């Protein structure tokens, strides 16, 4: 017997939550432990829970002590971990704590070798939390642009086109920095179509958007940009890695949970 509508709705809700739980979903997508180092990075509201799940699985094979790295989550969403550091930062408008943590993440993957593994854990909110302004602009300048984009009615794809080209870590730049190490991204999707290039602004995948796209969005919504941001969006060196870039050849993405899977639960 199903019971009252309230009980049915609660069961449906619990089923969807269980499907989305990193503790249950992540284990089936983990890559083998590497011969070299294992660096854990990531960002999102579920980043701490995902880090816990990785530690539990690595602990089962007796290699959890080899894990290192950090993930960024929203204030109030931190959980206790043993080897992977969890840093809290602001969402949806980035703050200095997020920038500092993102800089540490980028530094942690720089200089790795081909036997090393970067495991990137992404979930909803990752784009705002993984903020590292590209050279030439400040956090305050990026905040102004972010606020204007959030208030003008731009779509998530349009916002991300701007974010990527103003970032030192998004739009494939994280994976490019990690090369020649292998980069495996485990992502919980919260976007329509489950496009890895949109989830957290795609720090480990080729960016299909261009500088021209970013500037079109600015013009479309009549966004007034700080002079430094105008300069960044006008220089060719601000372009993000594209499909076929050799620096992305060892990067892959695995969607561990999608909205459709939660709905069907």
Protein language model features and the residues they cover:
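N-terminal loops that bind phosphate or other acidic moieties
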Residues: 1-265
């Amino acid at each position: 017997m199903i019971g009252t509508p309230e009980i049915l709705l609660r069961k449906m809700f619990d089923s969807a939550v269980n499907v989305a739980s990193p503790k249950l979903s992540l284990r089936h997508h983990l890559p083998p432990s590497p011969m070299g180092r294992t660096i854990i990075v990531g960002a999102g509201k579920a980043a701490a829970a995902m880090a816990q799940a990785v530690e539990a699985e690595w602990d089962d094979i007796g290699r959890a002590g080899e894990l290192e790295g950090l993930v960024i989550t929203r204030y109030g969403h931190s959980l206790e971990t043993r080897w992977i550091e969890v840093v809290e930062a602001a969402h949806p408008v980035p703050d200095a704590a997020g920038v500092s943590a993102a800089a540490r993440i980028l530094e942690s993957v720089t200089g790795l070798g081909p036997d090393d593994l970067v495991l990137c854990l992404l979930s909803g909110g990752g784009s705002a939390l993984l903020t590292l302004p590209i050279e030439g602009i400040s956090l305050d300048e990026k905040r102004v642009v972010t606020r204007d984009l959030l208030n003008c009615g731009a779509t998530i794809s349009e916002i991300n086109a701007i974010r990527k080209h103003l970032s030192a870590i998004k739009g494939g730049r994280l994976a490019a920095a990690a090369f020649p190490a292998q980069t495996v991204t485990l992502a919980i999707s919260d976007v329509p179509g489950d496009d890895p290039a949109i989830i957290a602004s795609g720090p480990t995948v080729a960016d299909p958007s261009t500088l021209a796209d970013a500037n079109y969005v600015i013009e479309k919504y009549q966004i007034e940009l700080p002079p430094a941001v105008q300069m960044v969006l006008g220089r060719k060196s601000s372009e993000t890695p594209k499909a076929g870039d050799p620096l992305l050849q060892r990067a892959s993405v695995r969607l561990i949970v999608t909205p459709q899977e939660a709905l069907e639960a």
